[in-house]
Amino acid sequence: GALVFDAPGPTFRHEAYEAYKEGRAPMPDALRTQMPLLWELGELLGLPVVARGGVEADDVLGATALDACQRQPVLVVTGDKDLLQLLRPGLRVVRARKGVSEFTLYDEEVFRAEYGFPPDRFREYLALVGDAADHVPGVAGVGDKGARKLLETYRGLEEIYADLERHPGALRRKLEDGQPVAELDPDFKDPYALDWSKFIDGRLDAPYDTGVAK
């Protein structure tokens, strides 16, 4: 196991999209002052405590989980829906929905039953619907139902836009207008776009030993 935290400072997403997480309230003082204690707790429990500058905790978590699941079953615990795109054989996700009172355990089958398409299309879904929590726009007017319907048929944005002429007029215009945003978001919302070999060789910017997923 491991505890993964955001490092201080901006990430590559802030450089790519200036309004990323704009308007989000800062961490409450009561929580911020306890962060060093959480790091110490991880060390006392024998858990690697991991953070890396320039990326988010999700990036570290995703890269670590994908590397580890090649050798052993992995369970990711998170409140962030973005990490559902990690789902694959040997990797499940527990998503906290209401603080620590309600959880959903996802595998590929549970995800597909809920969304109607496979997990490897989830970042395309996020590109279409956007993410209000991160102040990231989607394709205006497509919405949740429209995105699900498209991704039941198409494997991703490339296929959707290659087949643009076949979409009904109103939907086609929405997709055309939103294409610049849609084409930004898949990589922008990808939580594991890290080269694992470089990731491990450079170690991680954390104050403790971070030999994760050995």
Predicted regions located by residue number:
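Noncatalytic, basic helical substrate-engagement surface that gates or grips nucleic-acid strands
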Residues: G1-V77, K81-D107
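Non-catalytic nucleic-acid-binding/docking modules located in mid-to-C-terminal regions
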Residues: A2, L45-L47, L66, Q70, ...
